[in-house]
Amino acid sequence: MRRRTIFFYICTLNAQLMVKAFKPYDIQFVGLKIGHHEFAYDIDSTFFEAFDYAEFNDAALKAHVFLDKKTTILDFKFEVSGLVNVNCDVTNETFDLSVQGQFELVVNFGEEFNDDNESILILPHGSFEMNVAQYIFELIVLSIPAKREHPGIKDGTLNSDILSKLEELNPNNSRYDQDHEVDPRWEGLKNLLTDN
């Protein structure tokens, strides 16, 4: 029984910390006048820690949320730019990766909450605020390329032991061909392909 109480306390404490971490991202749209509004946020590694996301070593980003409030709908435009420090997928060397992205969201009001469509959000009538932290988080994460490659690999300025070893083991490398004899059975199979 005591373990359950401690577990419940820890879960409650974590939930309270998350709510506190995301509180600055609440936009209370009820008190705003009809028209354009802008909200700016500085995003660092603590933002990603609140989401329990550990893909970035560090982050220095700016997020801008533009709200165009109309009588029946809210038009949001999210823009993110800055740098995240990540590990290269090839060499595991750290580097700063430039991030830029934008996303538009239309918020409408209805009987119940519905976020089935990625660009339309329906909030229940009577809602007075909206938290934009999840949208900023997803925009940043989805703006990162699938393969994170150190820029020094492309321009040849990166000196890395891993990169040297990969180059040495490259089968297209002539040095590799000299060091490794080809089994004569494979040569016979190659001849079958070229005899046609």
Residue ranges: model-predicted function:
Residues 2-29, 110-196:
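Charge-rich, low-complexity linker and terminal segments
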Residues 6-90:
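A positional/architectural concept
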Residues 41, 96-97, 133:
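Residues that recognize and position ribonucleotide moieties
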Residues 53, 89-96, 142, 194:
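Short, intrinsically disordered, mixed-charge
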Residues 79, 100, 145:
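Surface loops and adjacent helix of pleckstrin homology
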Residues 85, 93-94, 186-191:
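Basic (Lys/Arg-enriched) interaction patch that binds polyanionic ligands
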Residues 87-116:
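Helix-adjacent hinge/juxtasegments
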